[in-house]
Design a protein with these regions (language model features):
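Structural signal for interior beta-strand "rungs" in well-ordered beta-sheet cores
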Residues: 76-185, 189-192
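Short, acidic/turn-prone active-site loops that include or flank metal/cofactor-
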Residues: 17-21, 36-37, 189
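Cofactor-binding loop segments of dinucleotide-utilizing enzymes, especially the Rossmann-like FAD-
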Residues: 17-18, 52, 79, 187
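Conserved acidic residues
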Residues: 13, 45-46, 92, 146
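NAD(P)-binding Rossmann-fold cofactor-contacting core
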Residues: 8-26
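Glycine-rich adenosine-cofactor-binding loop
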Residues: 1-5
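Phosphate-bearing ligand-interacting subdomains
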Residues: 23-83
Length: 196
């Protein structure tokens, strides 16, 4: 994330993390405080939530809500080696990492992660807070629900939908719409665990 922000021309002022890490260095940038300190920087800085999908999007969403309540603005970051069509839309707080592609007519919502070398094809919809992992392929007109996770190298066939909060395992191939919340894996992708 840091290298993507640097390549996009952002000046990074510092990092917020947990209290135990204050003063630590991450790729040349100091951890200057915790999320509770966000309001101190809200007037002069835009924020990017760098935490990805860890078992669910709940922790990431909690941080986004906390920063929003503190009056923070969010940057949309597109790495210099990524391609985003001028006919695509990206929501506030979304990040598109190196070598990722977002093609014409695609709509990527707020606070999404389009990870390294992921491909979001024409007319795809990626809803709020979804994470499209490294090398995933979302074919034309497919849809990814809010807070869903599409694992590394997974493929969504054209026009299929993945439901909100669902997880698609690495390397899985989604050939039909999977609207029931759950964890899916395989080729073709099958439900392996229902979400409660």
């Amino acid at each position: 994330m840091i290298e993507a922000a640097e390549s996009a021309g952002f000046a990074i002022k510092g990092i917020l993390d947990v209290a135990e890490r204050i003063g630590d260095d991450v790729l040349g940038y100091k951890i200057v405080g915790t999320d509770d300190d966000a309001a101190l920087y809200a007037a002069e800085c835009d924020f990017v939530v760098t935490l990805g999908f860890i078992k669910s999007s709940a922790v990431r969403n909690h941080i986004i809500d906390k920063l929003t309540a503190a009056g923070c603005r969010f940057a949309t970051v597109v790495a210099s080696t990524a391609h985003v069509s001028r006919h695509a839309t990206l929501g506030e707080g979304t990040v598109v990492l190196h070598r990722a592609t977002v093609n014409a007519g695609a709509s990527v919502g707020r606070h999404c992660i389009i990870n390294t070398a992921a491909n979001v094809e024409h007319d795809v919809t990626v809803a709020y807070g979804a994470h499209v992992s490294t090398g995933a392929m979302l074919n034309g007109e497919s849809r990814v629900g809010a807070g869903a996770f599409v694992g590394s190298g997974a493929v969504l066939a054209q026009c299929v939908a993945v439901g909100a909060g669902s997880v698609i395992g690495a390397g899985s191939v989604v050939t039909v719409s999977l609207t029931e919340p759950g964890i899916y894996a395989g080729n073709p992708a099958r439900l392996i665990n229902k979400k409660k």
